[in-house]
Regions:
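Intrinsically disordered, low-complexity, mixed-charge
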Residues: 1-79, 84-149
Length: 149
């Protein structure tokens, strides 16, 4: 036997607490990224909530944030899962393109402020259906939707 019943329960409780702490930590990072990105995006004056410049900004900023605070590799993983690597339609291709560009911006940024300014500058230099790896892109205005996501 491995100790008394109260000792076994105490070990189980400690193990459960560790798992709960790990789960809380793992959940806090996505909440941080989504919270900061949506707060910033909602305050922007960019048009096109979905498929437009605002959507491109959201994707670029989220990816830059993850690359800056974590790793560009994490952006690759999320893009592969959420956007199917950009395959399927123009919207997914646009999102994957902006994720890759945002990750590059975040990976090279020297500061949080610079990273955010560089993403906004990339959006301001972007355009509809741009086929340039160094420019943010979005769909034509007739495809924009007035949504947050």
């Amino acid at each position: 036997m491995r100790g008394t019943a109260p000792e076994r329960w105490a070990r189980r409780l400690r193990r459960l607490r560790r798992w709960l702490a790990l789960a809380a930590l793992a959940g806090s990072y996505p909440a941080f990224v989504l919270g900061t990105v949506y707060a910033t995006t909602l305050r922007s004056d960019l048009p096109g909530g979905r498929h437009g410049p605002k959507d491109a900004y959201r994707h670029g900023l989220a990816s830059a944030t993850v690359a800056y605070t974590g790793s560009p590799r994490w952006v690759e993983w999320v893009t592969a899962v959420m956007e199917d690597g950009g395959r399927g339609d123009a919207a997914r291709a646009m999102d994957a393109h902006n994720n890759r560009l945002g990750a590059r911006i975040g990976a090279r940024a020297g500061s949080w402020t610079q990273m955010r300014a560089d993403v906004l500058a990339a959006v301001q230099a972007g355009g509809a259906m741009v086929e340039d790896d160094d420019r943010i892109t979005w769909l034509p205005p007739e495809r924009w939707q007035d949504r947050l996501y």
